[in-house]
Amino acid sequence: RGISMNKSKKFIETKEYKRFVEFCQACIKYKYIGICYGLPGVGKTLSAKQYSNWNWVEKQIDYKKSEEIGMNADEKILEAKTIFYTAPAIRATKMTNEIDMIGGKMGMVKSMYRVLQLGAEEKYSTNVYEEIDLIIIDEIDRLKVQHLEQLRDIYDQKDVAMIFIGMPGIEKRLARYPQLYSRIGFAHEFDRLSKDEIHHILEYKWEE
Protein backbone atom coordinates (compact mmCIF):
# COMPACT_ATOMS: atom_id res chain seq x y z
CA ARG A 1 0.00 0.00 0.00
CA GLY A 2 1.04 3.59 -0.31
CA ILE A 3 1.64 5.62 2.81
CA SER A 4 1.13 9.35 2.87
CA MET A 5 2.54 11.33 5.78
CA ASN A 6 0.62 14.54 6.46
CA LYS A 7 3.57 16.61 7.56
CA SER A 8 5.76 16.24 4.52
CA LYS A 9 3.05 14.93 2.15
CA LYS A 10 5.62 12.51 0.76
CA PHE A 11 4.16 9.38 -0.78
CA ILE A 12 6.20 6.28 0.01
CA GLU A 13 6.08 3.64 -2.72
CA THR A 14 5.64 0.38 -0.88
CA LYS A 15 5.63 -3.15 -2.32
CA GLU A 16 1.83 -3.09 -2.25
CA TYR A 17 1.75 0.14 -4.24
CA LYS A 18 4.13 -1.30 -6.82
CA ARG A 19 1.94 -4.40 -7.10
CA PHE A 20 -1.07 -2.13 -7.60
CA VAL A 21 0.72 -0.27 -10.42
CA GLU A 22 1.51 -3.58 -12.15
CA PHE A 23 -2.15 -4.56 -11.79
CA CYS A 24 -3.27 -1.27 -13.41
CA GLN A 25 -0.79 -1.73 -16.25
CA ALA A 26 -1.99 -5.28 -16.89
CA CYS A 27 -5.63 -4.14 -17.04
CA ILE A 28 -4.67 -1.43 -19.55
CA LYS A 29 -2.57 -3.79 -21.65
CA TYR A 30 -5.33 -6.36 -22.00
CA LYS A 31 -8.25 -3.86 -21.85
CA TYR A 32 -9.85 -5.82 -19.03
CA ILE A 33 -11.99 -4.95 -16.06
CA GLY A 34 -10.04 -5.62 -12.87
CA ILE A 35 -11.27 -5.88 -9.29
CA CYS A 36 -9.13 -4.59 -6.44
CA TYR A 37 -10.30 -5.41 -2.94
CA GLY A 38 -8.93 -5.01 0.56
CA LEU A 39 -9.80 -4.02 4.10
CA PRO A 40 -10.47 -0.37 5.00
CA GLY A 41 -7.30 1.64 5.57
CA VAL A 42 -4.84 -0.54 3.65
CA GLY A 43 -4.26 2.21 1.06
CA LYS A 44 -6.46 1.32 -1.91
CA THR A 45 -7.85 4.82 -2.51
CA LEU A 46 -4.55 6.53 -1.75
CA SER A 47 -2.74 4.29 -4.24
CA ALA A 48 -5.35 4.84 -6.95
CA LYS A 49 -5.11 8.61 -6.52
CA GLN A 50 -1.31 8.45 -6.58
CA TYR A 51 -1.30 6.27 -9.71
CA SER A 52 -3.71 8.60 -11.54
CA ASN A 53 -2.05 11.74 -10.09
CA TRP A 54 -5.64 12.67 -9.29
CA ASN A 55 -5.14 15.45 -6.75
CA TRP A 56 -3.23 17.32 -9.45
CA VAL A 57 -5.53 16.40 -12.37
CA GLU A 58 -8.60 17.46 -10.39
CA LYS A 59 -7.19 20.98 -10.00
CA GLN A 60 -6.47 21.13 -13.74
CA ILE A 61 -10.04 20.29 -14.74
CA ASP A 62 -11.69 22.47 -12.10
CA TYR A 63 -12.09 25.49 -14.35
CA LYS A 64 -15.02 27.89 -14.05
CA LYS A 65 -14.74 29.91 -17.27
CA SER A 66 -13.66 28.87 -20.75
CA GLU A 67 -10.70 31.27 -20.74
CA GLU A 68 -9.28 29.44 -17.72
CA ILE A 69 -9.00 26.12 -19.58
CA GLY A 70 -5.41 24.93 -19.78
CA MET A 71 -4.03 28.13 -18.23
CA ASN A 72 -2.17 26.38 -15.41
CA ALA A 73 -1.47 23.12 -17.21
CA ASP A 74 1.99 21.76 -17.87
CA GLU A 75 3.18 18.80 -19.95
CA LYS A 76 2.07 16.38 -17.22
CA ILE A 77 -1.52 16.84 -18.40
CA LEU A 78 -0.68 15.00 -21.63
CA GLU A 79 0.31 11.95 -19.57
CA ALA A 80 -2.99 11.95 -17.64
CA LYS A 81 -4.86 8.96 -19.06
CA THR A 82 -6.66 7.64 -15.99
CA ILE A 83 -10.01 8.82 -14.62
CA PHE A 84 -10.47 8.33 -10.87
CA TYR A 85 -14.11 8.38 -9.75
CA THR A 86 -15.68 7.70 -6.37
CA ALA A 87 -18.95 5.78 -6.69
CA PRO A 88 -21.75 8.22 -5.92
CA ALA A 89 -25.18 7.95 -4.34
CA ILE A 90 -26.90 9.19 -7.50
CA ARG A 91 -28.91 7.74 -10.40
CA ALA A 92 -27.01 5.48 -12.76
CA THR A 93 -27.50 7.75 -15.80
CA LYS A 94 -26.23 10.76 -13.84
CA MET A 95 -23.14 8.75 -12.89
CA THR A 96 -22.44 8.04 -16.58
CA ASN A 97 -22.84 11.75 -17.40
CA GLU A 98 -20.40 12.67 -14.62
CA ILE A 99 -17.74 10.22 -15.84
CA ASP A 100 -18.24 11.48 -19.42
CA MET A 101 -17.84 15.03 -18.17
CA ILE A 102 -14.55 14.25 -16.39
CA GLY A 103 -13.20 12.64 -19.57
CA GLY A 104 -14.40 15.62 -21.62
CA LYS A 105 -12.77 18.15 -19.30
CA MET A 106 -9.48 16.26 -19.31
CA GLY A 107 -9.58 16.24 -23.13
CA MET A 108 -10.38 19.94 -23.23
CA VAL A 109 -7.45 20.88 -20.96
CA LYS A 110 -5.10 18.73 -23.07
CA SER A 111 -6.33 20.39 -26.29
CA MET A 112 -5.93 23.89 -24.86
CA TYR A 113 -2.49 23.06 -23.47
CA ARG A 114 -1.45 21.98 -26.98
CA VAL A 115 -2.86 25.21 -28.44
CA LEU A 116 -1.45 27.59 -25.81
CA GLN A 117 1.93 25.97 -25.16
CA LEU A 118 2.73 23.92 -28.25
CA GLY A 119 1.15 26.11 -30.92
CA ALA A 120 -1.11 23.32 -32.17
CA GLU A 121 -4.30 24.14 -34.04
CA GLU A 122 -7.54 23.98 -32.07
CA LYS A 123 -9.33 20.69 -32.51
CA TYR A 124 -11.63 18.87 -30.15
CA SER A 125 -12.56 15.22 -30.27
CA THR A 126 -16.17 14.10 -29.90
CA ASN A 127 -14.92 10.94 -28.17
CA VAL A 128 -14.28 12.01 -24.56
CA TYR A 129 -12.39 8.76 -23.91
CA GLU A 130 -9.99 9.11 -26.84
CA GLU A 131 -6.98 9.78 -24.61
CA ILE A 132 -8.18 7.76 -21.61
CA ASP A 133 -6.92 4.21 -21.12
CA LEU A 134 -8.22 3.44 -17.61
CA ILE A 135 -11.22 4.35 -15.44
CA ILE A 136 -10.88 3.56 -11.72
CA ILE A 137 -14.15 3.39 -9.77
CA ASP A 138 -13.65 3.57 -6.01
CA GLU A 139 -16.15 2.33 -3.39
CA ILE A 140 -17.84 0.05 -5.91
CA ASP A 141 -19.69 -1.60 -3.00
CA ARG A 142 -22.14 1.34 -2.96
CA LEU A 143 -23.40 0.73 -6.48
CA LYS A 144 -26.62 -1.00 -7.46
CA VAL A 145 -27.09 -3.29 -10.43
CA GLN A 146 -28.23 -0.37 -12.66
CA HIS A 147 -24.94 1.42 -12.03
CA LEU A 148 -22.95 -1.71 -12.79
CA GLU A 149 -24.88 -2.09 -16.06
CA GLN A 150 -23.97 1.48 -17.00
CA LEU A 151 -20.30 0.84 -16.25
CA ARG A 152 -20.40 -2.30 -18.37
CA ASP A 153 -21.91 -0.19 -21.14
CA ILE A 154 -19.08 2.35 -20.98
CA TYR A 155 -16.56 -0.51 -20.96
CA ASP A 156 -18.15 -2.20 -23.99
CA GLN A 157 -18.55 0.94 -26.05
CA LYS A 158 -15.47 2.99 -25.24
CA ASP A 159 -12.61 0.50 -25.46
CA VAL A 160 -11.08 1.43 -22.07
CA ALA A 161 -9.86 -0.67 -19.17
CA MET A 162 -11.64 -0.38 -15.82
CA ILE A 163 -10.78 -1.12 -12.21
CA PHE A 164 -13.38 -1.52 -9.48
CA ILE A 165 -12.12 -0.91 -5.94
CA GLY A 166 -14.05 -2.30 -2.98
CA MET A 167 -14.11 -4.33 0.21
CA PRO A 168 -13.28 -8.05 0.44
CA GLY A 169 -16.28 -10.02 -0.79
CA ILE A 170 -17.03 -7.65 -3.67
CA GLU A 171 -15.69 -10.23 -6.12
CA LYS A 172 -18.37 -12.70 -4.91
CA ARG A 173 -21.10 -10.09 -5.25
CA LEU A 174 -20.03 -9.21 -8.81
CA ALA A 175 -20.05 -12.91 -9.69
CA ARG A 176 -23.85 -12.71 -9.44
CA TYR A 177 -23.91 -10.55 -12.58
CA PRO A 178 -22.61 -12.88 -15.30
CA GLN A 179 -22.70 -10.27 -18.09
CA LEU A 180 -20.37 -8.04 -16.12
CA TYR A 181 -18.37 -10.80 -14.47
CA SER A 182 -17.42 -12.37 -17.80
CA ARG A 183 -15.49 -9.19 -18.62
CA ILE A 184 -13.39 -9.27 -15.46
CA GLY A 185 -9.86 -10.38 -16.27
CA PHE A 186 -7.89 -9.73 -13.09
CA ALA A 187 -8.48 -9.63 -9.35
CA HIS A 188 -6.01 -8.03 -6.97
CA GLU A 189 -6.04 -8.26 -3.19
CA PHE A 190 -4.58 -5.24 -1.46
CA ASP A 191 -2.67 -6.47 1.59
CA ARG A 192 -1.62 -4.71 4.76
CA LEU A 193 1.98 -3.66 5.18
CA SER A 194 4.36 -6.30 6.46
CA LYS A 195 6.10 -5.73 9.81
CA ASP A 196 9.40 -5.26 7.95
CA GLU A 197 7.96 -2.50 5.80
CA ILE A 198 6.39 -0.69 8.76
CA HIS A 199 9.76 -0.83 10.52
CA HIS A 200 11.54 0.46 7.40
CA ILE A 201 9.04 3.34 6.94
CA LEU A 202 9.26 4.40 10.58
CA GLU A 203 13.06 4.39 10.37
CA TYR A 204 12.90 6.42 7.18
CA LYS A 205 10.54 8.99 8.76
CA TRP A 206 12.66 9.10 11.92
CA GLU A 207 15.77 10.00 9.93
CA GLU A 208 14.07 12.97 8.24
Report each predicted region and the residues it spans:
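Charged, amphipathic alpha-helical linker segments immediately N-terminal to NTP-binding catalytic cores
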Residues: R1-K10
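Pre-Walker A adenine-sensing motif
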Residues: K15-I28
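Walker A/P-loop nucleotide-binding motif
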Residues: K31-S52
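Residue-level preference for the first positions of well-ordered beta-strands
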Residues: I33-I35, T82, I132-L134
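Post-Walker A helix-loop "phosphate-sensing" segment adjacent to the P-loop in P-loop NTPases
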Residues: W54-M71, K76, G107
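A short hydrophobic beta-strand->loop->alpha-helix junction that borders the nucleotide-binding pocket
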Residues: K65-G70, A80-R91
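Mid-core helix/loop region of P-loop NTP-binding domains shared across ATPases and GTPases
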Residues: K76-I77, P88-I137, R142-I154, L193-E208
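Sensor-1/coupling segment of RecA-like P-loop NTPase cores
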Residues: L143, I154-P178, H188
